[in-house]
Amino acid sequence: MIQGFSHIGIGVRDLDASIRFYSEVFGFSEFYRLDFNDNEVAATMEQEGAFRSAMLLRGDVRIELLQWVDVPTSGGGKKPMTELGFTHLSFRVDEIDDLTEAVLAHGGAVHRQTLSYVGPEGSAQTGLLYYTDPDGTRIEVMTNVPQLSELRQ
């Protein structure tokens, strides 16, 4: 039985730069960092080779960043939302404008500079905007998102 959400893993080109991005833009803290040299952990990921890993924390949210050291990687850049599988991270935020400046200053990108508002009529509108991190992982930020306890009533 599922007890809760553990973490999400994100492949990155530069572990140190990605730690800075998620720490300085979104306020994550580095919990630990590990180096794996072609061992059983890499084998569980169906890949041989060395990689570096860092676990970042912010409240109950955990992000594991993975950088392959001696293995060619692919991807990077913005993936289409129509691609199957993982499409984006989404964070509830207090405010969006200051984040945009921080994302750009730390190597990320803003998509279309459009801020949309959605929600049922007569309720507070949820603002949302999409960014990407320096490796193209799409990140949605949302304001005025109801807490789960409010939705369950």
Where are these regions (language model features)?
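N-terminal beta-strand motif that seeds the catalytic metal site of vicinal oxygen chelate
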Residues: 1-17, 34-36, 41-43, 86-91, ...
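Short N-terminal helix-initiation segments at or just after the protein's N-terminus
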Residues: 1-9, 26-41, 72-81, 107-108
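Surface-exposed loop/turn and secondary-structure junction residues enriched for glycine/proline
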Residues: 8, 54, 118-121, 145
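Core segments of cupin and vicinal oxygen chelate
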Residues: 11-60, 105, 122
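Vicinal oxygen chelate
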Residues: 13-16, 59-61, 67-135
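Residue-level detector of high-confidence beta-strand sites
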Residues: 31-33, 113, 141
